Every structure is written in structure tokens, then in C-alpha cells.
Amino acid sequence: MEATLEQRPFPYLATEANLLTQIKESAADGLFKSFQLLLGKDAREGSVRFEALLGVYTNVVEFVKFLETALAAACVNTEFKDLRRMIDGKIQFKISMPTIAHGDGRRPNKQRQYIVMKACNKHHIGAEIELAAADIELLFAEKETPLDFTEYAGAIKTITSALQFGMDALERGLVDTVLAVKLRHAPPVFILKTLGDPVYSERGLKKAVKSDMVSMFKAHLIEHSFFLDKAELMTRGKQYVLTMLSDMLAAVCEDTVFKGVSTYTTASGQQVAGVLETTDSVMRRLMNLLGQVESAMSGPAAYASYVVRGANLVTAVSYGRAMRNFEQFMARIVDHPNALPSVEGDKAALADGHDEIQRTRIAASLVKIGDKFVAIESLQRMYNETQFPCPLNRRIQYTYFFPVGLHLPVPRYSTSVSVRGVESPAIQSTETWVVNKNNVPLCFGYQNALKSICHPRMHNPTQSAQALNQAFPDPDGGHGYGLRYEQTPNMNLFRTFHQYYMGKNVAFVPDVAQKALVTTEDLLHPTSHRLLRLEVHPFFDFFVHPCPGARGSYRATHRTMVGNIPQPLAPREFQESRGAQFDAVTNMTHVIDQLTIDVIQETAFDPAYPLFCYVIEAMIHGQEEKFVMNMPLIALVIQTYWVNSGKLAFVNSYHMVRFICTHMGNGSIPKEAHGHYRKILGELIALEQALLKLAGHETVGRTPITHLVSALLDPHLLPPFAYHDVFTDLMQKSSRQPIIKIGDQNYDNPQNRATFINLRGRMEDLVNNLVNIYQTRVNEDHDERHVLDVAPLDENDYNPVLEKLFYYVLMPVCSNGHMCGMGVDYQNVALTLTYNGPVFADVVNAQDDILLHLENGTLKDILQAGDIRPTVDMIRVLCTSFLTCPFVTQAARVITKRDPAQSFATHEYGKDVAQTVLVNGFGAFAVADRSREAAETMFYPVPFNKLYADPLVAATLHPLLANYVTRLPNQRNAVVFNVPSNLMAEYEEWHKSPVAAYAASCQATPGAISAMVSMHQKLSAPSFICQAKHRMHPGFAMTVVRTDEVLAEHILYCSRASTSMFVGLPSVVRREVRSDAVTFEITHEIASLHTALGYSSVIAPAHVAAITTDMGVHCQDLFMIFPGDAYQDRQLHDYIKMKAGVQTGSPGNRMDHVGYTAGVPRCENLPGLSHGQLATCEIIPTPVTSDVAYFQTPSNPRGRAACVVSCDAYSNESAERLLYDHSIPDPAYECRSTNNPWASQRGSLGDVLYNITFRQTALPGMYSPCRQFFHKEDIMRYNRGLYTLVNEYSARLAGAPATSTTDLQYVVVNGTDVFLDQPCHMLQEAYPTLAASHRVMLDEYMSNKQTHAPVHMGQYLIEEVAPMKRLLKLGNKVVY
């Protein structure tokens, strides 16, 4: 017997066995005996024979384990020894199309048969086995001693272990290959369930149908992802799980070309419908929920044989059964093509040969879903043992978003009955509370975002302008009004305004003015897309710069301060909320009360305000000595006006108010009136102290931080009216290159003071110069005299902040902007006063009432109009003041560089900020009808500043303006009122239309004063740092976007016999022969053939194993991402980085990839992590008026939908129009174009920040959660992928049979993995996360039994709407 065995070339070629385990035992026994048969002295010579022995062993043993798995139930497993000769190709199957026999006389349909083309794919798996030469030598050594036998046994064990390692690798490789094949044919359940619904497939693939399908995708993702987790907290969790599993079973196609094959059955003989492949934890949960029906099933004990003879590989289909081998095909089809079919003749074909395959009992868990038995197993242990990732454990990325700092519009309401303490409508949220993955409440405020919102790229308009030029290369040139100041060659302001308004019949309204008057809904409406197009940046006003004879270009000027943000994006109520914050953070107690404000407002709107007050102001023109000289007259006017009307005279002038408070507290005027004046001055002082407290006392280099925080504290913003030499003082102290334009002359050097400034000191010091002053007044051409007549500046007495608070805050609020600049003709004023007989007649008693001696004339008219009865001496003293009065009212244009935090610009003069200062002019109220004729002879309107350009007031000062506003009624609004470009150019000004719009619409209250002060906070990084420190709103909201990653465990369902697996013979080759070892490589050919007539597998996420990111509030550090961007002032740049908390490091540190993922410079710099990997939050600046409902549903963070799958025929042009064309409504919200114009438009701030096109020079590969929503190429790719995905799946699932001309393979379409693992990429939507604008809303939400999303006045809560539904627990309170 031994000799017989010894001569067999391949001993133990096949071992017949009934049980799978016996196969392995017999093969191993044969291997050990075969070791004894090998003879030879040289180990390397023996290795040749050993190679043949190894091939025998692998042929017998391999792939037995696969038959023991439940996964084999989804396959038809066949041994195919000639597989190595086959290449990838197509195999034809013939199927019959069923029909319906009609009973109404219609002709029956003919039988239709189709040829189905199935792709056969080969797979190559292999393993290496390395055997030591010493062990092989021991096998061939003589065994003479017991030690020899011991070494021999040890060598056999060593070699057997190595062989077992290789065989085990191949067996696992087969299982892994089959699982990979199944996954390749397994779309997500939400796709199959939706597209497989005949309700949709019967309607065709129109726009509406595709839109419905995508909506169902989204709904299924949110409602049914991770259904096992959701079932745990349901009252009917088991029924829900059964429903989900039933949907999975129903979604797949059970029809295969192997009809009737029942390879695997239960013990009772019932067919196993399929197999559920999952992970250990999911399997345990399912078993606990559903219970095990049976613990074993009957399956084949060996592979079926498949033999091919001939040149071609043919698989035939007859009677709906797959033939066992080629002989059956030959006998049935080829040899006897005309044979009549019979049951006896076709017994073998009908049985498929399975009656000859021996069966055995296989351990498996079976569950019953509906009426079907399904095997369930987990292969996770196989992967865990090999330390390879399990294919059913997938990492899924979900992007979340939430708002910070939104302002809820009026009327405000509450849906909560338990929240108390935050009822005030003035409370404005500056933070958002979120809950991280460990249920820790975290606050995200502006302090967190400083590393983003303070970065220079956030404050640079250049890229936005370039993007606009590329997107709209041929802009409408426009009218050019308000874009650039035009210097005038002369100093005659009357001529300037007269020439401008004379015959003017056309008014131009710049965009900045238009936006200030529309509502939020109107601005965002599709019909306003032209107006909205240039609203792309929160900090800049963009405009089209006309170029005669050339194409226009886009330019931008800085908005400078918060108040210049258009009202639709920062409404009046919001600014008043910021004012309340200003009061709170500075502990501001208003000195002024509502009564005083009402008196000022009544005075401003008093049609009988004495014109004589302006005459007195003109004679005093801010000079304290002249005020003291004329105190009796001033006291008389104040007392008369107060007694007659209860109103305050001279309240329009800061200097008059200050002088009254300083010199008239001795009872010369009524105590009540003096109290009002003192409250006005006290309010200004209190506001100044509050501003200084808010800004702090730090310095940046040599610049006080106060200059960079508030425009009111910036010395480069001068008061609007000047009577002293503030210009030289500015030039001497400024480092921003100030230029004072006096007509067409530039005063830019203090050394030229004598050329441009004529100082008028005290009257007693000018006694010797009175003749020269008179000669200059009479002889000089004041139109061409480019000299300013002002008094010397007393620095000890000069407080510009109080003056600016008065003119830029108090008066606009109390008068509702009902004021206009006024020029004075001093010569005519003097004539009115002096050319009267009693004034200088010695015969008239100085103490007599002058009205007793005046003849009819202008002076008598204005005195009678004001019911003022001065003495002759009072008028004489007033006339004396004229001796050193200025000659005319003049205008000086003050141009300075912007502060270094606002120095970025699109053009050179955009780096400048300018204002017009009215020299020796005044701010006037409306003039009464009875005084207008007199007023016209002495005064004229000078609309030079947005806060001092009320057209209705100007119309009362001169009939030319009255005729103008009558011809053009739309010019009666101060916001759109056209003024000469020689006086003002709105885009260059400190104050723009939104400030004037607020002043015109606000309620005159102390709160409005605080609001106007806070509106002067600058839109710059130092100001943001200051406001964030004090929890004060900076003027814009933020959309925070964060991507989190979860480790999800999936369920894969495969229907029975849906894949045919062909297993070939192994090939063993020596890969390497060394002196100490021999390496063998075992390669196996495997082929797979999908035999189902549709999708036979489906996958669904069932359980969240872990959340790998912290779901926290860590903000992106743009200083690290864009290290090359910097402010021009290095000291400022370093100050901002320090205050923003930017971690500095060497360039090597910046290159660490962790910095791009988590926003930290290096991992070793972190002492530790508490909640897992830091998830990066990115900031998208957002208007505070954005709809909060937008953040309560899955939406695109850029503010406009970007999913274009609903297009009839996909094209990039259509996709781009839907993305960027704001004349088309947002498909998700038909009432508007966008929810955030600063992010959704071409060239918007969000676009240039996160569109990778604009970051290529920095770090193109940087990780960014916002990139997926902004980078156009990515969006197009995802849209095209989704469009293709829907079309491809619809074509496969439409129900039409596949033919040879429509070769469709039922595999997952490209992009399916992205859809499953990154649904936010594909759907272009982020999910709302639990977020509350105040901690109290979060506490109320967690403590209420019936969970809801409460709204309480200005506070709101956003519930989490996402596929992963978290169990939220704060303390002992749980909310799901």
C-alpha cells in the first residue's frame, strides 16, 4: 500500500467527505503522511517536491470555511478548475418576460425573451508561506534517536503552522472578496426604497419627480438612519426595527437566473431568503430584539463542479434553471436540439445537479422577518483578529451649522411659560450655547471667533472686487454720483449750492442710499438682484467705477463703522439693542432724561424758533469772550423763549450750550432751563467716560487703542463745525497724512499755516488790526481767498469728543436728523444789525427797548417774530462783536488715511476717509414762514454732511431748494437727497446713509443716544476684540459650520443565490529560495457573477458606534491657514494676534497637518484632549436679520440652495445660474434670493474666504468644513454626481427589462459611497445642531417634559435635525 502511495504523483488529490470538518481533518492527515513519503538529502531539492505537495494540500483544504459561513447562502458556489483560462467578460442569460392574459377580447401578447448580459469579474487572492530550510531538512533526516523523532515532530508542527497561516489567509480572503462583491452591488436603502417605488418610476424623470426623490432621500436619511439607536427609546421599538428590516428585504430584487435554487434551507426544509451581514454589537441587538428562530441551517458539504469543454465559456438557461455543467448543455441543446421536452428527460436539468451534492448542518443564527427566514451573522471577529477594518464599519461625516448673534424681528413673542429674566426686548444675543458629544454645554461667542473675524483676509476687499470683475465684466457704468469728491476752485458756498440746484431736474440715488430705505424682505427679493449684487461684504460698500471710453470696474470703500451697515441688514431695533449692551457693559447711567430730550425735540421741530438766535450765534461764532460780552442779550433770549414756549434756545450749538452751562448758573436764566442745559452737557461727559471705559487704555505702538475702536474717539474725525484752528492741530498730531482741501488748494504741512490759516484772537488783542480786518473784508475777493478765518485753538479747553458726541449723536437723535448746515453772509447780518438809527444814536437811552425806536425793517421783523425785546445797549454790544467776525462761511475738506486696521482697499483713494467741515457755519432747524424772507438775506443752506442735509430744512432757508424738492418729491428724504459733490461724496464719508436713516426713524430716547454712540464703533479687528471682551455685538452675525465624524455600523442584506462564485485551482510557485528559507506564493483565481435581475443587496446604517470628534466650539485659526496675510502695521498685526489668542510658531510648526485639521499648531503643544479630536468650526459672516427658521431645517450654510438635481438636462450653465443668479429665487425659499448675501453671491466674503479658487496661493489642500459649500468645482462635481446617480439608479430600477442594447449592471453607481459617507457634500446641506441663543433656553428645553423649540422674546432655540439623533443629558434631565 505504501509503495502504491509513493508512486502517486499527487497523493491525496481529493478527499471525499460528507462533513466540512472531515474535509479539513482528512486533508491534514494526508499532509502528515505525505511528509514521510518525501525522500532526498538536499533541502532545496526537496522543496521542489514539497511545492507539489503544498499544491495538493491547498487544493483540498482551501475555501471550506467559506461554506460554513452564512454569507455563502447568498451565493451559488461552484468549483471551476479551468477558471485560470477565463478572462473578464460578459455572459449571456436568456429570460422570459411575463405577460397578462386578458379576458376582454384583446389579443394576447406574444412571449418575449430577452438576453441579459452579466459581467463576470475575476479576483486574484494570494498568500505567502515561508518555510525555514532547517525545518525541511529535519523532515528528510534519519530518525535514529528519540531526540531525532522529537525534532522531526517539532518540524512538522512548525511547517503545519506556516501552512495553516497561509490557508487561513486564503480562506479569509475569499470571505472578504465575497463581502466586497456584495457591497459593490449594495446601494443604500434610502435610494433603493425611493427609486424602486413604482409611484415615482411610473411618472418618468421630470424635474418635479427628481425633486420629490431628493426630498425623500433627505427625509429617509434624517428619519431612519441608525434605526437601532432610535428604536431603543421608542415604545414600539421592535416593530420599528422589523419595519426597517422588512423595507430592506422588500427593496432588493429576489429574481435571479437561478430560479428555484434552494441551496440553503432551514431544518424543516424552508428556504433561507437571504443573509444579514453586520457587526457584533448590531447582531447582538438584533438578536435581543427579534429572537433566534433556529440555530442551524442545511447547506452543501462541498462545491458543485463546473466543467467546460470547447473553446467558449457558455452558461445556458433552460426552464429558468442553471444547467449543472456543459455536458447537460451539449446533451440538451446541441446534441438533441429537436428532442421533445419531458420531465423524465430533463430531470437532471430540473434538479440543477443539487441532488448529487451532499448536504450538512451548518451553525447559523436565523431570524424571521415577516414570513421569511433570514440568516444573520457577523464577520467582525475575522477582521478584528487580522487587525483589518471591517467593511461594515464606516466613517460618516456630517456637517452641522448654527447661528450666532441673530436679531429676531418685531413683534417678539414667547412660546415658553417658564423662562423669566430675559423678557427685555433690548436684550441682544451675542453667543450660542451648544452641547458637545459628552453632553457638556459650551458657549460659542465672538471671543471664540476672533482668530477668524480679525484676520486680514476678512478685511480685504481686493479679492471680492476681482471676483466681481470676472463674474460681471461689463457692469453698468451708472451715474457716478456720490463716488468721488470734486474740489471747487472757489470758496463761495452760496454759488456752489446755487449752481447745483438751479434747474436740476434729475436726482440720482446711489446704492448705499437705496439699501438704507428698503426692508429686509425687499432687499433679498429676486426683483432687487441688481441692488443686491454689490452687497457682498459686511465691511465694505462696493460700487461700479465708471471709466469713460472703457469698461467700468468694481471698487469698494470701507463702511468704517457699524452704523453704516444698511438698515435691512442691521435694523433700528438691532442698533438699539446694541445701545442697551453699551449701557450695560459700561454701567452707563444717562444724565439726560426723557423730559430734556422731549424739550430738545420740540425745539428742533418748533416752527417759531427765533431767527434772532442764529444772528446771535453768527456774531459769537464759538468765541467765549463774545459770549460773555453778550450774556445779557443771550439770557434775555433764553428766558423769553423758555417762558413763551417752554423750549431751549441755542440748543443747536455745542459751544453755546457749554458757555451757558459755564457762565449762566448764577440765576440769569430760569433754573429749569439751566438744568436742561446742564443735563445735555452732563450727558456728553458721561458718554465720553463710558466710551473710554469700553475702549480701555492700551496702546498699539504709539497709537491709543481708543483711536481704533470708536470713530468718536478717533481724532481724525473732526466735529462738523469749526470756529478754531483744529486743522493745524490735527496735522501736528496725526501720523495718517491729513490733507485739508481749501478750495483747490491743499493745506498739508503745518509750516504753511500762515498761508492758509488766518488766526483771529481776542478782540482786545486785535484793536490795532481792526483797520486791516475791515480793509480785507471790503477789498478782498473772498471767492478766491483760500484762507480760513478761525480763532486760535486752546488745547486746554478743547474737547473734540464732547463736541462730536453733541453733533453726531445727541442732535441727530433728538432732532431725528431734522437739521441742515447753514452758511452765513456776515456782511448782511451786520447790515441788518447796524443800519438802524437807534443802535448808535447818542440821543437814545441805552436801556430803552429797542423796538420802541426801530423803524420797519429786517431787524424789527425778526425781533417781533421771536417776541424778543432787547435793549439798545444789547444790540450795540452785539454789533461790536461784528468787528472781528469772519468774512464768509467756508468749507474745508479734511482727508486722512484710514486707521491701519481699515487700510485695505481696492484703489488708492479708497485708503482715505474724508469729511467736510463747515468753518464758521452752523446747524439750523427749519425756519418759520414769517421769517423766511429775512432769513434769505442773511443765511443760506449748506448740506455738507449726511446728518446735516435735511432737504425740508434746507427748503425753508432758500426758495431754490424749496422749488427743487417740489419738482422732485422723492428728494424730500434726507437719505436720498442729492448734494453737490463739491461738498460731500457719500462713499468717501465717515457717515453714510444708514446713519441718517436711523436718525430719521429712531425714537428720541436715552436708549437711542446709546444706540447712536454704539453705531460709531468701528468695523475693524481692534474694535471686534474690544466688543467681544465686553460681550457686545459687533454688528454682524455668524454662521458657524462644523464637520463631525461618526463611526457607524451598517447592516448589509443579501438575497439568496444572487451571486455565483467560481473557485478555481490553486497555483503554487516558489517566489524566493534562500540558503535559510524558501518562500512559496499561493495564488487562487476567483470569479464572481451577479445573477440577480436587479439589485440583490442593500446596506443601511444601523448604529453609531462612536462619535470620533468632540462636536465642540474650536474655531478655525485663519492666521495659521493664511500666514502670509498681514496688516501693514506690524505692531498692530502682532497686537491683534495676541488678543485673538493666535498661537505663534515657526514655519515648521505651521506645516503640521494637524493644524489644518484641528486648528492647532502642533499636537505636542496640547497637554491633552478631553472630548476627542477637536472639530474645527469655521465662520461665515451673516446679516443679523437672517431668518432664524433657515437654521432650523437642513440648509446650505452659504444662504442659498446649491443642489441642482432637478434640472431636466444637466449643464454647467444651468447649475451656475441656480448657484449665483439671484434674479432667480432660492429654490428652497421662493420668497427670497438668499438668506445671506455676504456668502451666496459671486465675489462675496464667504465666497472668497472658502472657495478654494481664491486660496491656491496659500494652502490649497487645507481641510475646511466650508469648502464643500463654496468651491464651485466641488459643488458642480457633487451636483453632477447626484444628477448622474439619480438617473443611473432610475434607469436600473425603472422596471424595464434589460436587453443586449441596454447593458446595465446592477452595481453601485459612482458617487454612492460619497452619498452614504458624506451626504452633506452630495446634498449641499448642513444639519442644524442643538443651539440656544441664551443658556436659559437650553435649560428650559432640557427641563420641559414636552420637548419643543422655545422662542422667548429675542432668544431662540434650534433643535437638532440630523441623521444621528443624540440622547441629550444635562444633570438628570434627558431629552431625545
Curated annotation (Swiss-Prot):
Broad class of where this protein is predominantly found: virion
Any Gene Ontology CC annotation: T=16 icosahedral viral capsid
Superkingdom as given in the UniProt entry: Viruses
One MF term in the entry's GO annotations: structural molecule activity
Pfam family, one: Herpes_MCP
Keywords carried by this UniProt record: Capsid protein, Host nucleus, T=16 icosahedral capsid protein, Virion
Protein location: Virion; Host nucleus
InterPro entries the record matches: Herpes_MCP, Herpes_MCP_upper_sf
Transmembrane segments: none
Subunit and interaction comment: Homomultimer. Makes the hexons and eleven out of twelve pentons. Interacts with triplex proteins 1/TRX1 and 2/TRX2; adjacent capsomers are linked together in groups of three by triplexes, heterotrimeric complexes composed of one molecule of TRX1 and two molecules of TRX2. Interacts with scaffold protein; this interaction allows efficient MCP transport to the host nucleus. Interacts with capsid vertex component 2/CVC2. Interacts with the small capsomere-interacting protein/SCP.
Family designation: Belongs to the herpesviridae major capsid protein family.
Functional description taken from the UniProt entry: Self-assembles to form an icosahedral capsid with a T=16 symmetry, about 200 nm in diameter, and consisting of 150 hexons and 12 pentons (total of 162 capsomers). Hexons form the edges and faces of the capsid and are each composed of six MCP molecules. In contrast, one penton is found at each of the 12 vertices. Eleven of the pentons are MCP pentamers, while the last vertex is occupied by the portal complex.
Annotated protein name in UniProt: Major capsid protein
Organism: Human herpesvirus 8 type P (isolate GK18) (HHV-8)
Lineage: Viruses, Duplodnaviria, Heunggongvirae, Peploviricota, Herviviricetes
